Amino acid sequence: MALVLSYGSAHAEDSPQWLTYPGGEGPGKGKHIVLITADQEYRSEQSMPMMAKILSKHHGFNCTVLFGVNEKGEVDPTMIVHPEKGREVKEHHIPGLEQLASADLVIFVTRLLTLPMAEREMIVKYIDSGKPFIALRTANHGFNTDLPYKINGKQVNWGREILGGDFMGHHGRWHADSTRGTVVPELKDHPIVRGVSDIWGNSDVYRTYKEGTSLPAGCTALVWGQPLMGRNPDDAPNTELEPLPVAWFKNWQTSEGKSARVFQCTMGSGTDLQSAGLRRLIINAGYWGMGMESDITATRSVDIVGTYKPLESGFNYAELGVVPKPVSAYK
């Protein structure tokens, strides 16, 4: 079955294939943030509309949420990313990527996507533009195939080179540990962590570099993630596991020598984002990325707009109640 794509203009408009949230008053008035949700484990199809509502209502940004969809045009976190017995991997699609042309910031929450070349090219055009972007949780292994992105004839690696960290495994017990985030003391006055406190999420810590090494040159760690012994915020730390960076920033030098501000946070599951501290960290990073540090305050609201009840993370879709749904179900 062919997927029928109905794209709009470069300006975000209402569509049955993506969500738009017009900005109100606030420092973000007139600026456009695009949030891309296309993962299969961490319920970003719920969390990114929630974040878009906060950014539009409390901060004034125009927001567009783009979804990974199946061949029927449904938001489908159950699509496989590796061949399974009796099932082949089908291409993912993200309708509305033309909206990147008007974006001032993009937030990626993707995981092992197999995208058509035309869609990958639109993503590359943005990340090579010099504009800022944020990568959350699984976005550091966001694509199953290389992006068509070379600089001086050399293939560019999305996770390791652009973001500053690839997924190299779970640092602790997958779906059993949780993460306590603490701001790096030397960076306590950085604008991204202004007003940030009490970072906790029930996802585990990712390792993004080999043991005995560190973040790549040019990356500045902002938040350490300490694995806890359970999935409650007051659980004891796992003293056998060192804390690892879970949030950092860097600059990406594009093919034309432009410098894009990049922020990666390996926390960011749907349930992690119930933490106001984590939400503020990510929202502050957006301001920083767009060069709006002077507009970051410790008190501007990051409160959830309406109701937010994310499903638990995981691949046991039937048990969790994860099924394909129309985009409108996430408004």
PLM feature spans:
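Helical hinge/lid and interdomain linker segments adjacent to catalytic or ligand-binding clefts
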Residues: P16-Y21, E25, V34-I36, Q40-G142
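Catalytic beta-strand/loop cores that center a nucleophilic Ser/Cys/Thr
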Residues: S15-W18, S56, N62, E91, ...
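Sec/Tat signal peptide C-region and signal peptidase I cleavage site
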Residues: G8-A12
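A glycine-rich, often tryptophan-bearing local segment used as a flexible ligand/cofactor-contacting loop or short
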Residues: Q99, F108, L112-G195
